[in-house]
Structures are given as structure tokens and as C-alpha cells.
UniProtKB/Swiss-Prot annotation:
Belongs to the MurCDEF family. This is UDP-N-acetylmuramate--L-alanine ligase. InterPro entries: Mur-like_cat_sf, Mur_ligase_C, Mur_ligase_C_dom_sf, Mur_ligase_cen, Mur_ligase_N, MurCDEF_pg_biosynth, UDP-N-AcMur_Ala_ligase_MurC. It is found in: Cytoplasm. Coiled coil: none annotated.
Amino acid sequence: MTIYHFVGIKGSGMSALAQILHDKGFQVQGSDVDKYFFTQKALEEKQIPIMTFSADNINEGLTIIAGNAFPDTHEEIERALELGLPVIRYHKFLGQLIDGYTSIAITGSHGKTSTTGLLSHVVGAIRPTSYLIGDGTGSGTKNAQYFALEACEYQRHFLAYKPTYAIMTNIDWDHPDYFKSVDDVFNAFETLGKQVKKAVFALGDDEELRKLSLDIPIIYFGFDEENEFQAKNVIKETTGTRFDVYHRDEFLASFEIPAYGDHNVLNALSVIALCDYEGLPVEAVKKELKTFEGVKRRFSITEKGNQVLVDDYAHHPSEIRATVNAARQKYPDKKVVAVFQPHTFTRTRTFLQGFADSLNLADEVYLCDIFGSAREKTGNLTIADLAHKTKGNHIIKEEHTEELLKYPGAVILFMGAGDVQKFQAAYEKVLDNEVVTKSDFKKSAIN
């Protein structure tokens, strides 16, 4: 039996796919840079070997699954080609893997990971379901009927998939290093829609998705009355959100989610619509929606001292706005401080004013240096260009996060798609030292 070797196994999709193959009984290993990523924890728990990149890792008997970030000139891929080993790109392998299942591809400019996680949680509790989530989580469930997968639009990679269903959460202009306009993004989504076998579930409140022209049913969901599935009577509370769902103007049921913001209501509504279409019992769907704890790096909360620290993947103006609004809902009486690390120079330059406008919805704003990508390590702007447009003109360094101590009782949002987690980790150490220092002070005062 072949051994599957993943080139770039710590990538979020690659990590999830490796776990799926492992669960299905295949022998799996992989390689990556010698740096810790949160995605490797699950790999280590399943005892999947992780090596540092080296041509010496490549031997006879391997099938190479190559991450899309690595060119054919990568040393491991070059060696594999020299040896005549099968080399297949991540998205193409996944496209082959989902055949034979009732597959559900979740795509959209924003909300893919959260919606894939929610769908996997709900459907997986009702029917056997395999899933691949963009937070690095994957499961190859035995005798699975359904396969839920996050489908990324970047470089049109999702066109390798021909799923049974697709959920389209929204269309927005992102990845400006590849997509030239929102029309370019729309064309990619419509092309995917033409490959879907049974039906597309699309946000009807999105003017771009309303333009879809397909030969299969398009089931629209949203807040507007013309949608086939409509969320009404939304009640936002500090413990979550409640809402009613109407199907073709007839009451379906009332639902409750332990999540915040309109975007999470819409994510849940897409799942409700698909489950109803597939005939899954509404009471079971209601039960599972109430117990979803979220996905990694999506409004992940840590309480430290009197502050609330939130880790979030938000890296586009629309996502920052949604994250700030969610914080306002859950913590209406707290000050909101945004700590943001822009991801890629092209995105930062393209959406500079949009980033400023979204960040300024917070009470205070701190900016980290721009995180470059493997394809784009430098650019013709700096973080100062964005800082000049935001509240306070604050730039924060990893070694000086103690500035955030100025906001006792605040919610501090650490946002970005790069390595902004290291800023949160540094600040947590500052907070831990504060506790120790105060404890020592009390002891000396007593003595």
C-alpha cells in the first residue's frame, strides 16, 4: 500500500486532509517548515509523522500530495518527479476524494470555515459525515454518507470540485493579487455553480449571488422577504442569538445559536436550509445548533485577569466589521480594542481605507507590521500608511504589548490571517507577570 506524503502538511487544508486519510486507514506522513503551527496539534495527536523539508524525505513507494503554496521547483517535489512518483495537488486530490459521497462544498469570500464547521457539527450528529474544515480539522468518518468540505476560491482551486451541493455565503472582492475585480470573483463562483450536481444554497441578500444563472435549483436564504428561507424576529443577547425561520413564508421553527452577529445567523440559516432540503429532522437540527462551540481562530475567547482576549482570523474589512460587531453584542458594556495584523501587501494597499473604516469601529486600534506571504514578502507601503488613518496612530511590537494594560476590563481583539497569535501569546505572558508581581508585592507588604 502506498504511503501518502504531504508537502506542506501544516497548511490548514493539508492538515485536515491528512487526518481524513489517516482515519480511513491509509498510511500518512508529511513535511513542512520547522516552526510551530496550531494545525499540527491534531496531527501529533494522531501520531502522523511530521518532518522538516528535505529531498531526502522522498523515496520509492510514496504518493505525493503537494500543497498549493509550493511550486514544482520545491526540493521535495523535484525529487518526487525525478523518481517518477505520483504527484497530485491538494485540491485535485480532494476533488477525487469526494466522489461517492453526498458532498457539500461550502464557499464564499467570508464565512467558509465557520459555516463548514457548523454544518459538519449539525449533519455529523444526525448522519455519518466526513469533513474538511479550513481551521485544520478533518475527519474521515467510517461509512460516511455526507462529506462537507471548505472550498477556497483563491486561484479558482475550487473548480477541481464537482459537489452534490454548494453553499455560497457571499461574494466580495478579496485576494486582489489574483482576482482583478468583484466581477472576476463572480465569474469564478458561477463556474463552480455550473459544476454542482443537485442545488446551490446562496445568500439572497447578496446582490452578486442574485445574478447567478444556473441549470439547477438555487435556494436563496437571508433576511430579505424574497428569500426562500428567511430569518426573522432576531433577538441578540449576551449569551447568543435567537431567531425564527420561515420557508416560503411559512413558519418552520425557532432556533438558538451560541454565537454573535448577523453573519452567524446567516451561516446557521444556510445550514438549516440544506438540512431541510435533505429531509433531516428539524428538532435534531435545532438541538445541534445550540451546542456548536465554534472553530479554531474564529472569535476564540480567553479570559485573562479582568480582560477578555479574542483570537480571530478576520483579515478583510468586512470580516473586521463583523468581529467588532460580535464583540459589541457579547460585551455591550466593555471597551473594544482592536489589534490587527494586515495579511499581504497587495490586500493592505487595495483595501487601505476599508481597513481603516472597519478598524475605527473599535474604541482603540493597534496595528502590527504587515505579514507578507510566501509569494509576496515585501511591498511599496508600510504599516504606517494604515496607522495614519486609524484611531491613535498606534503601532504595536511583539516585545511591547504591555501597552494594552492601559485598558482594564476591555475586550482585546487580536485579528489577522498571519501570525498575530504571537502578539496575543506575548501579551498573555505580560498579564501572567503582572499577576506574579502583584502577588509578590502583597507578600512583601504583609511581611
